[in-house]
Amino acid sequence: MGCFSYRGAAAVVGGVVALAVTSAFAITPNKLVSGGLPAHTGSTTTDYLTDGYLTNWKSSNAKEIALNVGEGPKKLLINWESYGDCAWATDFTSGCGHTGVALSNFKILTSANSTDGTDGDWEVAATIENNPVMARGVLIDFAGKSWFKFVSEGDVGKLLEIEAFDMTDGGTDTWFFMGTSLSQMGIKQQETDSTTAQLIHARFPNYTPAMLRGGIGCINSTEVVAHLDEYLKYAGNVKYWAIEMGTNDAWGGGDWDLDAYVKNMQTIIDSAKARNITPIIARIMATNPEKSGWQINPAFLEAVDKLVEDNKLPKGPDFYNYFLEHPELLGNDGVHPNADGGGQAMHHLWAEALAPLYAASDSSKSGGSKQDSTTTARKVARWTKVAAPRVSVRGKIIDVSDIALANRGVTEVSLVTAIGTVVEKIHASSNTVRFSSNINAGHYLVVVRNAGRYSVSKVVVR
């Protein structure tokens, strides 16, 4: 099962989240410091390795890749995403055959005096050996340094993205999206309007989530447990596991594997907590019975709800009810998210479910009490479905019209790069605004916020 391609306009998932969030789940930001920087690959440079998108045909097999993130961070978390067939690992399940070459054997070097990524003095900050997974993060010391460089041995495969985050303050905004083929095909779609991380950043500008995609087609909870040591080895250094799991356990509509599923999920939860990882579990995605011939047994949904309640976990997205109401976002098999908005909806639903954590974290950092944090989370986490404005591009000018102005308060329209940099922010007094300064070719998001309403539109400048 491979990645889907989606080229869409704006979409906003509406709803109300009323989760009581306390400071126990407070998130410490880790600033993205590599977004949009040129990646030096010998005699050439490229920007698609740092543009925030996993475009399949824009990959690199260079054996040396260097980035200058500048001085300042004392520690860096360096994430990378490889293509493969979009599965996180190739041999964790017997149900599907997966292929792809992971970035397996390489060193990460750092320099304080390089000028172009090749000259200067370099030190080994990390050595990675026999890595089998397509997405991973490594923490390195970076005090006094300005450059880091991947130096690979052997086949590099297809490298899609490199991200570096400043971990000087002990950032905990780190995420691993464990899942089945639904996440493999949805969360790792080669192009969607915006990722969960981008949506969170657009709404909470102090945060730039470090996001690893871990979907594997055909995997079930029993196979996850069988490979928990590998999950913890290669994705155990993040703070949050965003888990989509259960479709293959519940396949066919019966409940014959329910007991095993509950036992396995509890094992996953316990193992994550033992490593100080907070698991957040999505409700299993509904099928389209007219095409699949079956539906998720309600007993599995009740089991997910009970696991969340009994373990006092933050609530994950309700994939079941959303896709039950939107079967048009499922593919021809009636099970998997399609390329015409299915993966896009998954990103939005995850962002909506996680918003209370960020709202509570913002409130706690501003000095509010625990009660205030909960109240703020309930208030900020309301997403009202609104029509996206009309966006047009003429050369390097972006016009935004048909903006729904707030009856009270300020309507804020922001132009944000795909990797989270705010280019310009305008307080709109009419339903039309224009962005014309510092606009280069690339992918952008137009974000409108007002009176609890929120929309995101994607735009490309050629």
Model regions and ranges:
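Active-site segments of SGNH/GDSL-like serine hydrolases
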Residues: 244-248, 268-301
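Serine-esterase "nucleophile elbow" of acetyl-processing enzymes
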Residues: 141-214, 229-237
